[in-house]
């Protein structure tokens, strides 16, 4: 499945009307924050002596992805494009893989 296919399939469960892009954007951003908190909570439980439940983690990461797709839909972005832009940015920043030196010495304007 491509990112765009996922995005298209996920649209059927967006509760905000498609013509209410600002509301959709707000819902996606607030939802992303909440779902990231769910992922953090799973990791936090490790410090309480519990193992990470991989099935639960996969479900929460799916919720994170759904929120990212909703944000893309609200902004008129294609998820495949966002994925490619991110990979291109990381290739430029870390041409031979991650290094602390490259991370500390990013090009001007690298965000």
Regions found by a protein language model. Give the residues of each.
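Flexible "arm" and connector segments at domain edges
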Residues: 1-111
């Amino acid at each position: 499945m491509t990112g765009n296919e996922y995005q298209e399939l996920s649209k059927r469960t967006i509760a905000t009307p498609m013509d209410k892009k600002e509301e959709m954007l707000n819902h996606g951003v607030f939802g992303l924050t909440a779902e990231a908190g769910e992922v953090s909570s799973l990791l936090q439980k490790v410090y309480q002596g519990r193992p990470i439940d991989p099935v639960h983690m996969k479900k929460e990461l799916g919720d994170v992805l759904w929120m990212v797709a909703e944000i893309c839909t609200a902004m008129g972005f294609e998820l495949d494009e966002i994925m490619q832009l991110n990979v291109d940015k990381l290739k430029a920043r870390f041409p031979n893989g991650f290094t602390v030196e490259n991370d500390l010495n990013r090009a001007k304007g690298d965000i």
